[in-house]
């Protein structure tokens, strides 16, 4: 059976080569496409550029082909934007035209073919989902309702680290404890739930399934079936694994969190009032018929993917940079002690009084952007950009990392220097008021989680610096900050071992 399938596929490839050659010649006369390497039939530029189109590799192509270039990845168009002006055009000026999301066979499995919010196309469904998610997740009221919980979780990290005898001597992988903190931060918001320890069986299952989902979705293993549709039958085994992981995740979300919350709601007396968690609002929308149960579960899916690990990576990067720059760490600690007083723990209302802490957060997001190419955009229909034709359903990547690290736009961008946000970049904020710096995107499809991420980053980094001297492990002058990823997400290659010496405040 496999030999027959292979024979048919080879014949299809041959026919497709002829068709692609003819079509490309015909289309070439009509379209003015962005510059880029010369594609070959069927494979496009895939064999030339490979799979790993991370933020740094795309900079090399931008230097060769310009701020707007096109890569043909098999049968898919990939358009890369590398300048502030073009970024404004894609994200804001033509935000409707380029406001959709690309999907593929793997993302279709994990999102139920766009039943979520983050990865759905721009249109009525997205507007409805965004509206329903905004009130329970992305308002200042949510911040005020949950800030004490975030502060409690940060304090719990401090307490647990102090109890660990290795933390002040040979060092610990702080990320492990911070991961539990981030899950608790978000599950408090969603379900008014938290996990007691890193060994909690449900936490371990959840973390493992989320990790497997990310690995499968971000893998290059399925590119051949995505780029060349006639080879898609060979992905059956891979897609079966994806479907199994998706089914187990959705079942876990439903049984242990959504259904449990429904039972709690049903046991309350009619008309009783109380502080609602996010899922209560989402379930009310389901009861009104605005969304269905699948939409509810995919909202939970989105939060697990988009809100937890991204903030965790940024915290990890920020702490690593402070370890490697003790003078900046000392300056930040001095601000905290001076403004708040020695031993007075930073809280969310204090953050506006701590400009250097805010600058450290902004500099971390600039140099070590968690999603360096943002979440990809797509134009549903043929479009124009900078005088070039952009064919319908092109994948649009904004190299946001390069916008914030281009030496033509930033002074010594390779340096971790928070002072830049007091000096030459004093006007720049993380909300995208300057298109050289858009860590959360801009416009309709910007990340609404900015309202949660910034205070959590400030509270967590602030408390770690207040309570500990952060040092590299014995025998090392710095921690390794080699990068891993960059096409989807950017994280540290090897999780840092940090020596955390308690301060006597």
Swiss-Prot record:
Keywords: Heme, Iron, Membrane, Metal-binding, Monooxygenase, Oxidoreductase, Transmembrane, Transmembrane helix
Tissue: Expressed in roots, leaves, stems, flowers and siliques.
One Pfam family of this chain: p450
Gene Ontology MF annotations: heme binding; identical protein binding; iron ion binding; trans-cinnamate 4-monooxygenase activity
Cofactor(s) this protein requires: heme
Binding annotation for heme: 447
UniProt name for this protein: Trans-cinnamate 4-monooxygenase
Organism: Arabidopsis thaliana
Origin organism lineage: Eukaryota, Viridiplantae, Streptophyta, Embryophyta, Tracheophyta
